[in-house]
Amino acid sequence: MTLIMIGVDLVKIERLENKSDHFVRKILSLDEYELYQKTKAKAIFLATRWAIKEALFKADNQHFCFKKINITKKDNVYKFDGFAISVSSEKEYVIAFVQKIGVACHRD
């Protein structure tokens, strides 16, 4: 049997509106924080990163410190080494689905 490591997180965007800079710096990497400072849609940016990082943690408990997880986005695809990430948003929610890639754990 192959073990599939997945994580899912659903976030209500309004929960991350008007967060203090101290809070934001605790969960975003330095690169993410620079992007956050430039965006007008701060709550959506923060909710998306939060959902992805929570889903990563649920898929693989090795990632404890959100600030050390740097999520990149290229060609509208979110990336973090070793994981496939899917994100969707609708009105007031963001959902992230994460699967660890290359896991070959077998149980007898």
Swiss-Prot record:
GO BP of this protein: fatty acid biosynthetic process
Pfam families the UniProt entry points to: ACPS
Location relative to the cell: Cytoplasm
Catalytic activity: apo-[ACP] + CoA = holo-[ACP] + adenosine 3',5'-bisphosphate + H(+)
Keywords: Cytoplasm, Fatty acid biosynthesis, Fatty acid metabolism, Lipid biosynthesis, Lipid metabolism, Magnesium, Metal-binding, Transferase
EC number in record: 2.7.8.7
This protein's GO CC annotations: cytoplasm
InterPro entries, A to Z: 4-PPantetheinyl_Trfase_dom, 4-PPantetheinyl_Trfase_dom_sf, ACPS, Ppantetheine-prot_Trfase_dom
Domain of life: Bacteria
Chain residues that bind Mg(2+): 9, 54
One Gene Ontology MF term: holo-[acyl-carrier-protein] synthase activity
The keyword Zinc-finger belongs to this UniProt entry's keyword annotation: no
UniProt xrefs under SUPFAM superfamilies: 4'-phosphopantetheinyl transferase
Family label: Belongs to the P-Pant transferase superfamily. AcpS family.
Function in brief: Transfers the 4'-phosphopantetheine moiety from coenzyme A to a Ser of acyl-carrier-protein.
Name the UniProt record assigns to this protein: Holo-[acyl-carrier-protein] synthase
Organism: Mycoplasmopsis pulmonis (strain UAB CTIP)
